[in-house]
Structure formats: C-alpha cells, structure tokens
C-alpha cells in the first residue's frame, strides 16, 4: 500500500522496519500519512493523519487514557449493547474473536469485562495502529496485565486463515465498514480519516461463512440500522440500538 510515511522521532529504524514488514511504500503525493511521533507524555506512538484536512486531527489507539479509559471506568460494563449481543451473563464470559478489530474499541469493552478476545485486522495500517496501541497499553501499570491476558492480536489478516478445529471460540464478532448515507453528516471527525483510508468493506460478505465455522455459540454482526443483512443471510434475531443493530446467528 502507498501512503506517506513520516518519522518525527529520533530513531526511525524500527518504524522503517515495521512499514517494510507490512508492505507500506512511501508516497509523497498521498494525503494520508502514517506518522511515528511523540505523545503528550513523550512516549513514541503511531498515528494516522489526513494532511489536507489537518483540523480533523490524528487517529491513534489509546486504551490507557481519554475516551477508552472513561468508557472502562464509567461506561455500562455488562450493560453495554455489545456485551449483551455477545451473550455475556452472570457467570458466563464467552471467548471471542473480533474479526474486524479496527481500532479495538468494542474488543476493549469486552476485554475489560473479562472476556478473552482475539483480534484480527485485515488493513495493514489499521493493524499497525492497533498493534502499537496494544503494546503501549500492555506496559501500563493499571490495565497492562489484564490486557495481556484478555486482548491478543493474532498473526493473521483474515479469519479464513484460522483453523476451525484449532481456533474455535464461543463468539465471532464482525463490524465491517459500511458506507454512510449519502446525505448524512459523519458523527466523528476521525471517522472521515478512517473511512478515507479503509473505504467501504466490499468483501465483507466473505466474512460470514468462516465466522460461522469458527463460532461454537454465535456470530454477532454489527450493522447500521439501514444496512442489509450480511451476505443476504437472515439472522436468528437482532438487537437494536439507536443507530445500529446487532444481527445474531446462532451456531450451537
């Protein structure tokens, strides 16, 4: 993939090696840039910037502070919609594969509750952002040990590469990117950056079959309320929220 590669830190060697490993090629004409920089505490982090719309800000993964820390401490916990959708109950914490991990937010909610979550991410830039955020979180004194136990990024880029006989879990969770309505305003500025990078998930339908093969209990698909069923396959039932629904396919 071609993207601007910018290093603002003193030691670019690791950044260069990571980019090479993930097939990223520096393109000085690209408006999207993967940047290795310093955060407010002086720690090295990776972030994504849209250079022609700097006001949108950078996209990065931070499980320790900011919105994710607030959600962990003051969010709904087991009452969150994603927790109900995967079937969390008193005394039952399913094992989960998040096959479209993205920035890891839903997976982090489940991991914070106590689920063991394995992550798969197909886009190389998003995978690097997620890997970087996890590594920084693993080193945190408050949540590092919990996340090392409960959130693991798998060394595959698609769940079709997993073996149902060896890698099965209770729940497979899917949240593929879906185009916004043409006239709708994007709620979050960072989503404009993220969607410009990833675009619509045109092969999302190909996720359902391997997901069903890996899930012992259910497959959960998060969709906008206006989106059709994944792979045109009707779920056993759905859970609806204000703007989304969770389509649930039972497997056992």
Swiss-Prot record:
The protein's Enzyme Commission number: 2.1.1.242
Residue numbers binding S-adenosyl-L-methionine: 105-106, 121-122, 175
MF terms in GO: rRNA (guanine-N2-)-methyltransferase activity
Pfam families: SAM_MT (PF04445)
EC primary class: transferase
Protein family: Belongs to the methyltransferase superfamily. RsmJ family.
Function: Specifically methylates the guanosine in position 1516 of 16S rRNA.
Official protein name in the record: Ribosomal RNA small subunit methyltransferase J
Origin species: Pasteurella multocida (strain Pm70)
Taxonomic lineage from the root: Bacteria, Pseudomonadati, Pseudomonadota, Gammaproteobacteria, Pasteurellales
Gene giving rise to this polypeptide: rsmJ
């Amino acid at each position: 993939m071609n993207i601007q590669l910018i290093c603002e830190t003193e030691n670019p060697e690791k950044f260069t090696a990571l980019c090479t490993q993930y097939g990223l090629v520096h393109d000085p004409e690209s408006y999207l840039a993967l940047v290795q920089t310093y955060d407010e505490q002086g720690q090295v982090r990776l972030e994504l910037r849209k250079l022609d719309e700097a006001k949108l800000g950078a996209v990065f993964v931070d499980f320790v502070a900011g919105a994710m820390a607030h959600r962990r401490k003051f969010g709904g916990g087991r009452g969150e919609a994603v927790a109900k959708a995967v079937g969390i109950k008193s005394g039952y914490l399913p094992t989960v594969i998040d096959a479209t991990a993205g920035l890891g937010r839903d997976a982090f909610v489940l991991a914070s509750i106590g689920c063991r979550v394995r992550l798969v991410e197909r886009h190389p830039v998003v995978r690097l952002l997620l890997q970087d955020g996890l590594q920084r979180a693993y080193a945190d004194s408050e949540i590092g040990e919990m996340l090392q136990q409960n959130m693991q990024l798998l060394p595959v880029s698609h769940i079709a590469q997993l073996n149902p006989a060896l890698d099965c879990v209770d729940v497979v969770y899917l949240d593929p990117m879906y185009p916004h309505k043409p006239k709708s305003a994007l709620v979050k500025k960072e989503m404009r950056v993220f969607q410009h990078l990833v675009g619509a998930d045109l092969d999302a339908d190909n996720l359902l079959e391997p997901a069903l093969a890996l899930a012992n209990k259910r497959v959960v698909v998060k969709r906008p309320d206006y989106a059709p069923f994944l792979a045109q396959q009707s779920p056993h039932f759905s859970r609806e929220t204000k703007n989304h629904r969770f389509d649930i396919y039972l497997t056992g």
